[in-house]
């Protein structure tokens, strides 16, 4: 039992015995015939089988797996382990679609670093179509001799009142007949405006008179008597 325990505790590589995995990861320790056999299994053509360095480079390029980070034994690590085969299948699918493309992908190799000046084509104003959807008419179509002006309601009322207050004037160059007509018209207009002003508060006047004559107001007014 003791000897069996000591055999278990011994390191397998302590006696110089190298495992098969370590041999596969170190092609310099493998024989030339074994490397050729591995390349033939991967269907990789070898131009010069006698060149040791060439065989080693092909082995490192096609046979040795890519290094991968070990995932932790947690929930996230288990989830990533399940998603790894999906990623590999998607990568193979994308590679097959890339190979089936008509035009190859453009890859910048860094050789052509000097780029020419970029020329921008200016749009031709003459060939551009004339748009008919305009919110306002162009300036050229507006007649400057007879412009149309829109006035608000307040301005029209003011203009009408001013026009009523003004005296009637004859054509240019004519002289009014007499100053008495001018004074009579101004007095008439003033009387008309005063009547308009008086008619508006006429409705509220009887109410105010009633309020003054009501007995409640008389009761509130008390005369102060001195002893």
Curated annotation (Swiss-Prot):
GO terms for cellular component: nucleus; tRNA-splicing ligase complex. InterPro entries: Ashwin. It is found in: Nucleus. It comes from the Eukaryota. Keywords: Nucleus. Its main location: nucleus. The keyword Zinc-finger does not apply. Residues 71-227 are annotated as: Disordered. The keyword Nucleus applies. GO terms for biological process: embryonic morphogenesis. Residues 153-173 have a biased composition (Polar residues). Residues 71-84, 204-219 have a biased composition (Basic and acidic residues). Pfam families: Ashwin. Residues 88-98, 178-191 have a biased composition (Low complexity). Belongs to the ashwin family. This is Ashwin. It comes from Danio rerio.
């Amino acid at each position: 039992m003791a000897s069996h325990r000591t055999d278990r505790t011994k390191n397998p590589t302590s006696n110089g015995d190298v495992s098969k995995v370590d041999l596969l990861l170190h092609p310099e320790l493998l024989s030339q015939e074994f490397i050729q056999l591995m390349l033939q299994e991967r269907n990789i053509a070898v131009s010069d089988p006698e060149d040791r360095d060439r065989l080693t480079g092909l082995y490192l390029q096609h046979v040795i797996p890519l290094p991968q980070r070990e995932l932790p034994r947690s929930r996230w690590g288990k989830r990533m382990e399940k998603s790894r085969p999906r990623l590999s299948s998607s990568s193979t699918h994308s590679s097959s679609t890339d190979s089936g493309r008509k035009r190859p992908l453009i890859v910048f190799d860094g050789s052509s670093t000097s780029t020419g000046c970029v020329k921008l084509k200016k749009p031709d104003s003459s060939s551009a179509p004339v748009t008919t959807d305009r919110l306002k008419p162009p300036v050229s179509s507006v007649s400057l001799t007879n412009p149309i002006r829109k006035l608000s309601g307040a301005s029209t009322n003011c203009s009408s009142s001013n026009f009523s207050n003004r005296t009637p004037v004859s054509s240019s160059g004519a002289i009014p007949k007499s100053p008495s007509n001018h004074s009579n018209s101004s007095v008439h207009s003033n009387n008309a405006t005063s009547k308009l002003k008086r008619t508006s508060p006429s409705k509220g006047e009887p109410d105010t008179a009633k309020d003054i004559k009501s007995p409640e107001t008389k009761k509130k007014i008390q005369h102060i008597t001195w002893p």
